[in-house]
Amino acid sequence: MNIDTREITLEPADNARLLSLCGPFDDNIKQLERRLGIEINRRDNHFKLTGRPICVTAAADILRSLYVDTAPMRGQIQDIEPEQIHLAIKEARVLEQSAESVPEYGKAVNIKTKRGVIKPRTPNQAQYIANILDHDITFGVGPAGTGKTYLAVAAAVDALERQEIRRILLTRPAVEAGEKLGFLPGDLSQKVDPYLRPLYDALFEMLGFEKVEKLIERNVIEVAPLAYMRGRTLNDAFIILDESQNTTIEQMKMFLTRIGFNSKAVITGDVTQIDLPRNTKSGLRHAIEVLADVEEISFNFFHSEDVVRHPVVARIVNAYEAWEEAEQKRKAALAAERKREEQEQK
C-alpha cells in the first residue's frame, strides 16, 4: 500500500482559530485520523499528514476548508463541531469515489446562515438542486436525513431573495403515525402546526426568527395543512409538499393541479414511512408510477449514502432497506408457492 506524507501550513497563524479547528483535546483531529485512517502530527499551525495518498489529500483539503470556516464573524471565532467534521469527511469520500466532482450548486444557492453557506454534500443532492432549478415540479424521494426538505427550503428562500417568486408556501398532509387529529386539542391549524415544525426550523435557520415572523405576517411565507390548498391556484409561488407519502391519490392530484404560472413545486417523501390506513395507496407511490414520463417533472431518489446526519443513521437506513428487501422476497416466494399448490390441486 502506498503511503504518502504531506505537510501543510494554515495561515494566518491564530491560536484561537487552531483550537477551534482541532476541537477540545484534539477531538476533531482524532476523528479525521480515525475515519480516514491517517496520522496527523501538529506543531502550531503546521500539520504533517501520513497515510494513503487519496486520504491525505482529502484530509489536507478538509483542514484548509474548515480553517477558513473558523474565521471570526462579528468578532467571534466560529467553533468547528464534530458534525461538521463528519459532513466534510463524507463530502471528501464522495469526491474520491466519483469520476467527477459534485456540481457546484453552491454558486446558485449561496445562503449564509448561522451554520455557514448551504450547499449540496453528495452528487444526488447536487442533481436534486439542479433539477429544482430546471423543472417546474420536482420530487425528492428517500430516507430521513438526506436533505430532501432542507435543500428544497433553501432553494425556495433563494428564489424569494432573488425576487424570482413572490411567496413561499409550505404544506404537508395532516397524518402522523399512531395519532388521530380529531383527538388533539385546538382547531385544524393548531393541530397540524407541530407537524410543520421541521419546515419552520429550516426557515428560522436560514432567515432568522424575526424575519420569518414578519414574512408570515405579510403572507409572503405561508405554512398550512394540505387541506387548505383545495380550490386555490398558486401563481408566482414556490410550493413545498413535505411528507407526501401520507397523501392519498386524490390529495396528490389536488395538490399538483394547484400550481399556477411562474410557480415551482417540490414534493418530498419517504415511501418506507407511510402512515395511511391499510389498503389506502400512497399518492406519492402512485405519482411515481403515473408521472414518470411527464415533461417538466423530475424524480430524484436518495439512498443511505446521501444521509448527512450521524453516521449511525446511514447504517440504520441500510439495515431497514435490507430487511424490507428480504421481506419482499419472502412474500413473493410465499405467493409463488401458493400459486403452485393451487395449480397442483387443479
From Swiss-Prot:
GO cellular component: cytosol
Keyword terms of this UniProt record: ATP-binding, Cytoplasm, Nucleotide-binding
Name of the protein in question: PhoH-like protein
Molecular functions per Gene Ontology: ATP binding
Transmembrane intervals: none
Compartment(s) of residence: Cytoplasm
Positions that bind ATP: G142, P143, A144, G145, T146, G147, K148, T149
InterPro entries per record: P-loop_NTPase (IPR027417), PhoH (IPR003714), PhoH2-like (IPR051451)
Family: Belongs to the PhoH family.
Chief localisation class: cytoplasm
The keyword Acetylation appears for this protein: no
